[in-house]
Every structure is written in C-alpha cells, then in structure tokens.
C-alpha cells in the first residue's frame, strides 16, 4: 500500500468517523425531545443514506487513481475506511456515555425501551381486536390470545426494568459499545462486499 493511499484512507476514515460522532452528540442534545419515529428516521435512515453516499464516493475516488481496483482492493478500501470510522464512533460513545454523561444515556434509552413496549402493546391489541371484529376469533380464542399478549408484555416490562436497574447499580459497561462495534462491522462487511462488486473494475477478477 503506497503512502499516498494510506494517508487518503486515514483521512477519509477520520472524516467519516467525525460524521458518525455527530449522532451521539445530537442524541445527547436533542434525544429527549425526539419521538421514536424521528429518532429512528434520523439515527438509522439518514445515517445509512449519508454513509452509503460517502462510502460509494470514496470507492470511486480510489478507483480513479488505483491501477488495480478488483473486488479485493475495492472491498479493502471500503472496509478499512468504515472500520476506522466505526472505531472513532466507539471512542466517542465510550467518552460521552461512560465518562461524561452516563446518567443521560440511561435516561434516554430507558424511556425508549418503555416506548417500544408501549407501541408493541398497542399494535398487538389492535391486531387482535381487528381479528375479533372480523370474526376470525371467537370469544374464547380472543380471551386466550389477549391473556398471552398481556403475559408477554408483563414479562417484557419486568425484563426491561431489571435491565435498567442493573445498569444503574453497576454502571454502563464499555463492552456494550465494543459489542456494538463488532456487530456493526459484521454487517458493514457484508454491505461493503456488495458495494465492492459494483465499484470494482469489471475486467479485473480477484
């Protein structure tokens, strides 16, 4: 790997990592006021769209000056840049949530867990009511299904409560964010491999 390529990989990885790091900062500043739909639209939808555009641009940038840009080289470029960026994001998360604002992290995510259970409850009961109204369930089947849903919700609520009590008592583990890094890199590797198939030079096979 030439020095110019190494430097460009590092610069692009740092730039993408800084972009990633904006999101936990936005969560800290505005997360409490966001609805779940806005949160997932911004932190998953917008994030993934911008990441995709950026990483494809980087791939094309390297393709323009690389004498060989087969699948292996294409994937290597995309994954190295992504791995650097996600590593920077992980450092930001650990610094922000473990060191400076652990209480805020717990508050934000505990509320989100409760909201998710509430949404699941509304959807499940609405689906059950519609099935009963349409005549797909008799009275006994409806009551049995409703009891199962309520039992599942009760178990979910108690599990979530226990989870956050444990975190409050023991603190936020750094392994949580390290685990997220490994999880993200696994799926990003698959996504990068798909992109590399399109970005590589078609007449080069590796």
Kindly give the residue locations of the regions a language model identified.
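Transmembrane alpha-helical insertion/packing segments
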Residues: 1-68
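Juxtamembrane interface at the cytosolic side of transmembrane helices
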Residues: 2, 6, 61-63, 67, ...
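Alpha-helical transmembrane segments of multi-pass membrane proteins
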Residues: 7, 11-15, 76-85, 179
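Alpha-helical transmembrane segments of multipass membrane proteins
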Residues: 19-27, 50-51, 85-89, 93, ...
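Membrane-water interface at transmembrane helix exits
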Residues: 27, 31, 59-63, 88-97, ...
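Hydrophobic secretory-pathway targeting helix
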Residues: 62-98
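Functional transmembrane-helix hotspots
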Residues: 91-139
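Individual transmembrane alpha-helix segments
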Residues: 145-186
């Amino acid at each position: 790997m030439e020095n110019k390529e190494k430097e460009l990989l590092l610069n692009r990885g740092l730039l993408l990592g800084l972009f990633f790091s904006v999101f936990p900062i936005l969560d800290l500043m505005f997360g409490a006021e966001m609805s779940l739909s806005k949160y997932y639209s911004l932190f998953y939808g917008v994030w993934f769209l911008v990441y995709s555009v950026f990483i494809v641009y980087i791939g094309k940038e390297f393709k323009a000056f690389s004498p060989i840009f087969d699948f292996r080289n294409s994937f290597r470029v995309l994954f190295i840049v992504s791995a650097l960026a996600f590593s920077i994001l992980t450092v930001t998360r650990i610094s922000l949530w473990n060191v400076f604002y652990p209480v805020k992290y717990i508050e934000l995510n505990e509320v989100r867990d409760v909201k998710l259970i509430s949404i699941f409850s509304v959807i499940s009961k609405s689906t059950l009511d519609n099935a009963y109204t349409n005549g797909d369930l008799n009275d006994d089947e409806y009551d049995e299904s409703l009891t199962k849903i309520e039992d599942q919700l009760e178990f979910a609520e108690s599990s979530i409560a226990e989870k956050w009590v444990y975190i409050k008592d023991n603190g936020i583990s750094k392994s949580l964010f390290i685990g997220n890094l490994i999880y993200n890199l696994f799926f990003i590797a698959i996504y990068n491999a798909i992109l590399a198939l399109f970005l590589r030079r078609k007449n080069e096979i590796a």
